[in-house]
Curated annotation (Swiss-Prot):
Region of interest: G1 motif: 169-176
Species whose genome carries this gene: Campylobacter jejuni subsp. jejuni serotype O:23/36 (strain 81-176)
Database matches in Pfam families: Dynamin_N
Entry-linked InterPro entries: Dynamin_N (IPR045063), G_DYNAMIN_dom (IPR030381), P-loop_NTPase (IPR027417), TRAFAC_Dynamin-like_GTPase (IPR051943)
Gene coding for it: dlp1
The protein, known as: Dynamin-like protein 1
Lineage: Bacteria, Pseudomonadati, Campylobacterota, Epsilonproteobacteria, Campylobacterales
Length: 728
């Protein structure tokens, strides 16, 4: 490693400890690690001036100077060599940075370095086990039942952390076969649980059962409205109306039916007409794979005629922790695949996802590699006007579900399983989930909550010993002083409550003129479409409907994302400023305010993202598609587009929905919960203090003799605190 640093830093190389390691291994993601590694003697001055780079350094308490930068690079490389950073992901990130930073030496070093393989699932579970052990020890040391109960609830909350995997693909991509191989049992697509056209959520349950959720009247009305612009959907619904009494299933409030798994074939089979009335299906099973707190979302095929099912799918994709897209290796990249993948690359919050080439046993290794290259190049060509590097978010694996299933059924040897690619797929999946951002956030949040409770317990025992010690020395004034301190904090607490109420009342909901911005976006979309139609007419070119819809997608979604990003920034900025001011004024509340604040902000961001109505947008696409196919002159087309686009954009009602989120009210509830938590602790401390003072006054032998016991507990708590701070 020293030779590498001599190459990239030359005469700027500092005196360094090449065994240096980060105290917290999870503070930086792979992209941030790559940015720090790309700093060298030729570019460090430019990097140091960038505001974004300064913010990155601040995140890990790193000074912006040469020594600190080189030391951080050593820490990152040691993390990488220990197996905590994915080699493949780090190389991808460095490759993207090549355009702004020449990083050949560091790239080659990582490429050639042999790294340890880490079982991320085992590591994650071990980290949780350590924190659970600390939690149980704190429960033993707790001084009241309320605190013990809070710690137990915290343990259960994090113990039940769930991961959601979404599986997508066109019909016949092999979803059921792959899932059966993953579950190691023929569970889906068999007689009892047929292949379904509905979105199906599969999760762990002690008993096996299913829940059927039907569309409500409002949702069904949207489907009917969509059918006016889609001939296939109209024909489908007309046939359905003649064969099924729709009113039996479509109610004002969604009808939910609990059924046994064996009854599922009567509802969900793609051949069964009733399946069209079903919004989603939830299946509970005690399959071994699902015991890992993993839920699998099996989505309808991308070529589904019911647009609303696609909207429900997109809502689940937004909440998923990982996305797996299946493609039949023999059929390669279809138009539907390409459209979906480009949409995900442009809009998904996920940092990466996986394409699995199914039925891999039907092609040679060389042919499979060619399919991967072709898929990457095809996607890059679709992204040429945007960002080709987005393709680097995709990983590829080749799997034969049949070979794996044959082994699990006892029809093939272990060699068949090893050649199937199924074990690599399963290991990849566990590593991505358990080393992902959700896992890191959960561990950090758990540590923070435990540390807060530990400090409360520690302060209680220290306070008791201070009272006992001062009593022995005959300093009763000090005891009264301590009592007054607690009473004063109670007064300040009331003051803080009043100030929070007044501050929240003065806060304005920030919508950044959202309705005007949406109308400007509508104007931009109409102009882009008219420019495209004029170009086609002037050059006597045939209409490419896919390109028209691509313009609609990219213009609308990019514009909406920009608007929402600004709204999120402004709203989060105002609540951060208020929280900071309150923490400075009432410093005894700082830890409580910090606890859970990142999760609160994340929730606000997700709520703001959800205000864009996907159903209205889907209807807009159908209307534009129909207008595009009509043989009308440019003037008539422009008039019709103007009406359709502006009317639909007004229907988005984004300002109204944003106000209904009541962000200020939610922030008030967050702060109020923290005040209640602190108030409970203070009340408990005050009661304990008064009890101790009374016992001391009565010369109670038990309290007088508890000094040494408390010292042991204090020592134990300090050891637990060290364990908590060192826990990874």
């Amino acid at each position: 490693m020293k030779e590498l640093f001599q190459k990239i830093w030359q005469n700027e190389l500092q005196f360094l400890n090449f065994d240096a390691k980060f105290q917290d291994k999870s503070k930086l993601d792979t992209a941030e690690c790559a940015i720090i590694l790309s700093v060298n003697k030729d570019n460090y001055e430019r990097y140091f001036l960038l505001k974004e780079f300064q913010e990155l350094c601040k995140k890990i308490d790193l000074r912006v100077d040469i020594f600190s930068m080189q030391n951080a690079q050593i820490c990152i490389l040691n993390l990488f060599k220990s197996g905590f950073i994915s080699k493949q992901d780090l190389l991808k990130a460095l490759k993207i940075l090549e355009k702004i930073s020449k990083n050949t030496e560091i790239f080659d070093f990582i490429l050639q370095e042999k790294v340890q393989s880490i079982d991320q699932k085992a590591l994650f579970q071990n980290d949780f086990k350590e924190l659970n052990t600390i939690n149980l020890e704190l429960q033993k040391l707790s001084f009241d039942e309320n605190l013990k109960s809070r710690l137990q609830k915290t343990l259960e909350k994090f113990q039940n952390l769930e991961f959601n995997i979404a599986i997508t693909g066109v019909m016949n991509a092999g979803k059921s076969s792959l899932l059966n191989a993953l579950l190691k049992e023929d569970f889906l697509g068999v007689s009892n649980i047929p292949e379904t056209a509905n979105l199906t959520v599969l999760s762990y349950g002690k008993s096996e059962e299913a829940k059927i959720y039907f569309w409500d009247k409002k949702e069904w009305q949207n489907i009917l409205e969509s059918s006016h612009f889609n001939a296939d959907l109209k024909e489908f619904i007309d046939k359905l109306d003649k064969s099924v009494n729709i009113e039996d299933f479509i109610k004002d409030k969604p009808l939910i039916q609990n059924i046994a798994l064996c009854e599922l074939k009567n509802f969900s089979s793609a051949k069964n007409k009733i399946s069209a009335l079903i919004k989603k299906i939830e299946i509970k099973s005690h399959l071994e794979f699902l015991k890992n707190n993993i839920s699998i979302v099996d989505t309808p095929g991308l070529d589904d005629v019911v647009v609303q099912r696609e909207i429900v799918t997109n809502e689940y994709l937004r909440e998923s922790d990982f996305l797996i897209h299946l493609m039949n290796a023999s059929q390669s990249l279809t138009q539907k695949d390409a459209d979906f993948l480009v949409h995900c690359l442009l809009n998904s919050r996920l940092s990466k996802f996986l394409i699995v080439l199914t039925k891999a046993d039907l092609l040679s290794k060389k042919d499979l590699e060619e399919v991967i290259v072709y898929t990457k190049e095809s996607l890059k060509s679709r992204l040429v006007d945007l960002d080709e590097n987005l393709v680097e978010k995709i990983d590829f694996l080749c799997v034969s579900a049949k070979m794996a299933s044959d082994f699990y059924k006892g029809l093939a040897s272990k060699e068949s399983l090893q050649k199937s690619g199924m074990q690599e797929f399963e290991n990849y999946l566990f590593n991505e989930l358990y080393a992902g951002e959700k896992s890191k956030i959960a561990l950090r949040a758990y540590k923070k909550e435990l540390h807060l409770e530990l400090k409360n317990i520690l302060s209680e025992y220290e306070m008791q010993n201070r009272l006992i010690k001062e009593n022995k020395q005959g300093v009763s004034e000090e005891n009264q002083k301590l009592l007054l301190e607690l009473q004063k904090q109670n007064t300040l607490l009331k003051e803080a409550q009043d100030e929070i109420s007044n501050s929240i009342a003065k806060l304005k909901n920030i919508d950044s003129g959202i309705d005007n911005l949406v109308l400007l976006l509508a104007k931009k979309l109409k102009e882009r479409l008219i420019d495209e139609f004029k170009y086609l007419k002037n050059n006597a070119q045939k209409l490419n409907l896919s390109r028209i819809l691509n313009i609609v997608d990219i213009t609308t979604k990019d514009g909406i994302n920009d608007i929402l990003r600004e709204i999120k920034f402004e709203n989060i900025k105002k609540i951060e400023e208020l929280k900071t001011n309150l923490s400075l004024k009432y410093d005894f509340l700082k830890d409580d305010f910090d606890n859970g604040f990142e999760g609160f902000k994340d929730g606000i961001s997700k709520n703001i993202d959800s205000i864009f109505q996907s159903e209205k947008f889907a209807l807009l696409r159908l209307k534009i598609e129909k207008l595009s196919n009509l043989k009308s002159d440019l003037y008539e087309l422009e008039t019709n587009l103007d009406t359709v686009i502006f009317d639909t954009f007004k229907e988005f009602k984004m300002s109204e929905i944003l106000n209904s989120l009541n962000i200020n009210g939610a922030f008030f509830e967050f702060l109020n919960d923290k005040l209640k938590h602190y108030e409970k602790n203070q009340k408990s401390k005050l009661e304990s203090l008064e009890k101790v003072l009374q016992s001391l006054k009565n010369q109670d032998a038990n309290i007088l003799n508890s000094f040494e016991e408390n010292l042991e507990k204090i020592e134990k708590l300090k050891q637990l605190e060290m364990g908590l701070l060192n826990a990874d």
